[in-house]
Amino acid sequence: MLSSCSGNFSKKNESTNSVEASVEKSDIDVISESILSDSLNADLYVQRARLNLTNEKISLAIRDINSALSIDRKNIDALLVLADIYYALGDDNNILLTLNKACEYAPLDTRPIIKLSELSLLQGNFKMAGAYVDKALEMDKYNPKAYYMRGMLSMSSGDTLTALKNFMTSRMQQSDFVDPLIQIAHIYMAKNDTLAKSFFEEAMKVAPDNYYLVYDYAMYLQENGFPEKALSCYDSLLEAMPNNPDFNFNKGYVYLVYLGENELALECFDKVLQVNPSSVDALFNKGRTYEQMGDYINAKSIYLQILRNNPDYQLAIDAVNRIS
């Protein structure tokens, strides 16, 4: 439920999901064929429900989970996916009921307890979230997701040192768990510590196809002296999502600010404006590019165009005054 790998670029979910749908379609077909020959296998319905939920096909996911629970009403995996479905629907009450039911059916399984901790954290009930984490760790000290949640709770209170210790413990217990690696990288990035790069790279090895991670890594690279590597990351993202304006905008920004490649910057900002003509940021940076090229006529024309629709846009006001 808790999205620890939150992205910073807009309109990404729609594009990402379309890619995931094409990737997962064959997997869904395979599972569907297996269901035809083994229609009483609840786990198969759970697997297909997960894929449908990933692709935002909520009604299909619900149908599959209902099928799984009609076969085995105490199937914990089915109940956990059902809780995620309710989360997607914003139904906190049913999330709570479902997870409590899972705890009742499987009192030694820490997974529903961790999800209850996630729910409490999202609701701002930090004391309850901590109590659930403590309970999970009492049951099983080897619990990377519990330590990860403890780290997230520390982050919510601003205690990055304790958060870092818990994320490190989570990483030590499960080296292929990408979420704590990402949080560690962001903590070091906020401290301007060069260790951020090594943890981003470690996370990339674990989850090279995680678009949110690739984007965050690219942002780190461009801001820390590796513009060419940042461009490589944006290019890989654009291969998967060629119409995403944020990737082209960031490429343009790298060309403009870090590399001084004005013509390439203009190409990128124009691509953004083709997809999103109302992007003031892209239009302003196109003006900046012209200004940097010494083409003050085109630059001023763009700044004035911005001010006609956004008269309080201070950057454009300053730019016009600067040119004048």
What positions do the PLM features span?
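Structural marker of alpha-solenoid helical repeat scaffolds
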Residues: S37, I71, Y105-A106, M139, ...
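N-terminal leader/linker segments that initiate helical-solenoid repeat arrays
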Residues: S4-N66, S70-D77, A88, L97, ...
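Alpha-helical adaptor scaffolds
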Residues: E118, M189, M219-E223, D235-Q274
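Position-specific recognition of the canonical hydrophobic site in helix A of tetratricopeptide repeat
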Residues: L53, L80, Y87, I114, ...
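Terminal, low-structured helical/coil segments at or just beyond the last alpha-helical repeat
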Residues: N8-T16, E223, S232, G260, ...
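Structural signature of tandem alpha-helical TPR/SEL1-like repeats
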Residues: A21-D29, N55-S67, L89-K101, Q123-K135, ...
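Canonical tetratricopeptide repeat
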Residues: Q47, V81-D84, K115-E118, M149, ...
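Helix-start (N-cap) detector for alpha-helical repeat units in TPR-like alpha-solenoids
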Residues: A42-D43, I76-D77, T110-R111, P144-K145, ...
